[in-house]
């Protein structure tokens, strides 16, 4: 049963369903590895919290300039307890290490997300 939150990517019975929701039967291999391996296994490992995994993922996506995936993971980081101020500071810090254009692109995505939730 899907939880009450309308935009959730988890299902109590089936686990993570974001890949299935995105691709359905179009890409079953990608759906399987995204939902069952990455989110149901890797993200659930105990040595790092979901919050820490979110920060690491945001850093990696920022470094690679992957703004499409970054949008989801910035929002997911917020769901995992990372504050907007922490995300802003992390993005500023990342700009020095990943290149200013990547930092600016990431900050633009974060601003869009916060603008949407503030209205």
Language-model features, listed with the residues they occupy:
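Substrate/cofactor-recognition hotspot
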Residues: 93-95, 99-104
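Winged helix-turn-helix DNA-binding recognition segment
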Residues: 82, 86
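Short, structured motif recognition centered on aromatic/hydrophobic residues
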Residues: 53-61, 90-91
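Acidic, glycine/proline-rich low-complexity segments that act as flexible tails and inter-domain linkers
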Residues: 1-51, 64, 71-79, 102-119
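Short, charged low-complexity intrinsically disordered segments located at boundaries
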Residues: 65, 87-92
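Short alpha-helix boundary/capping elements
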Residues: 60-66, 98-99
């Amino acid at each position: 049963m899907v939880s009450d939150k309308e935009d959730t990517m988890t299902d109590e019975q089936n686990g993570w369903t974001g890949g299935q929701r995105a691709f359905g039967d179009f890409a079953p291999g990608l759906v399987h590895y995204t939902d069952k391996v990455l989110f149901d296994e890797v993200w659930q490992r105990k040595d790092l919290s979901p919050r820490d995994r979110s920060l690491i993922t945001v850093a990696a996506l920022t470094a690679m300039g992957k703004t499409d995936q970054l949008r989801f993971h910035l929002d997911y980081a917020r769901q995992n307890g990372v504050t907007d101020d922490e995300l802003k500071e992390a993005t500023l810090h990342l700009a020095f290490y990943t290149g200013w254009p990547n930092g600016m692109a990431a900050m633009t995505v974060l601003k869009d997300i916060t603008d949407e939730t503030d209205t």
